[in-house]
């Protein structure tokens, strides 16, 4: 099992649609960002990437790259899921918290959970979503998302990195000291 944590925040801006969890919500302002500004999908993506120790969303999809201007955040999520699968894991469940003053998420919660579940390929009962108001935190013009994801191995045949002692017995190392271990002469 692996656990990942993701966080994202965006400022509200006039003249753009509001997307949260892949669902367009009725609101006077949307969330600014280089892509579509979907704060929840961005946090989920980073949680998935973090769980497998992969580079974060900003490294894989840099805001400096015009290719990602206005991109659907589901593209980022699909790439993260592909990396998770290639690492031998799948999503077991996620839990998320949204912090924003408006709009109220309650009326849209089922739609958001359903869309996220579909994107992740899991049952809706495995997607937790809570919405909180910022109450005195001066966040009336922003939205924040926190996400925790639990991954499980897809099969027992998935390779798990050996412990340092096992690698030493095999005569190999990983990380900064990668390469074969030279036999030490006994004195």
Feature-to-residue mapping (PLM):
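RNase III-family endoribonuclease catalytic core
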Residues: 1-112, 119-120
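Intrinsically disordered, Lys/Arg-rich low-complexity segments
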Residues: 167-187
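Short, small-residue-enriched loops and turns at beta-alpha junctions
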Residues: 102-104, 134-137
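A structural signal for short, well-ordered beta-strand segments
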Residues: 96-100, 129, 145-149
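Pyridoxal 5′-phosphate
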Residues: 129-133, 141
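Short acidic capping loops at alpha-helix termini that bridge into adjacent secondary structure
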Residues: 123-126
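C-terminal edge-of-domain segments
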Residues: 137-156
């Amino acid at each position: 099992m692996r656990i990942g944590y993701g966080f994202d925040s965006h400022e509200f801006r006039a003249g753009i649609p509001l997307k949260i969890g892949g669902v367009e919500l009725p609101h006077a302002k949307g969330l600014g960002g280089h892509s579509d500004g979907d704060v929840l999908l961005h946090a989920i993506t980073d949680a998935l990437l973090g769980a497998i120790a992969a580079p974060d969303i900003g490294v894989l999809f840099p805001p400096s790259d015009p290719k990602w201007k206005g991109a659907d955040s589901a593209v980022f999520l699909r790439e993260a899921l592909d990396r998770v699968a290639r690492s031998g894991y799948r999503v077991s469940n996620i839990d998320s918290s949204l912090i924003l003053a408006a709009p109220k998420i309650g009326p849209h919660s089922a739609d958001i959970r359903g869309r996220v579940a579909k994107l992740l390929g899991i049952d809706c009962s495995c997607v937790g979503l809570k919405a909180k108001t910022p109450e005195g935190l001066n966040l009336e013009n922003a939205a924040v998302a926190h996400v925790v994801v639990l991954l499980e191995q897809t099969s027992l045949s998935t390779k798990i990195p050996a412990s340092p002692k096992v690698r030493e017995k095999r005569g190999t190392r990983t990380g900064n000291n990668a390469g074969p271990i030279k036999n030490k002469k006994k004195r």
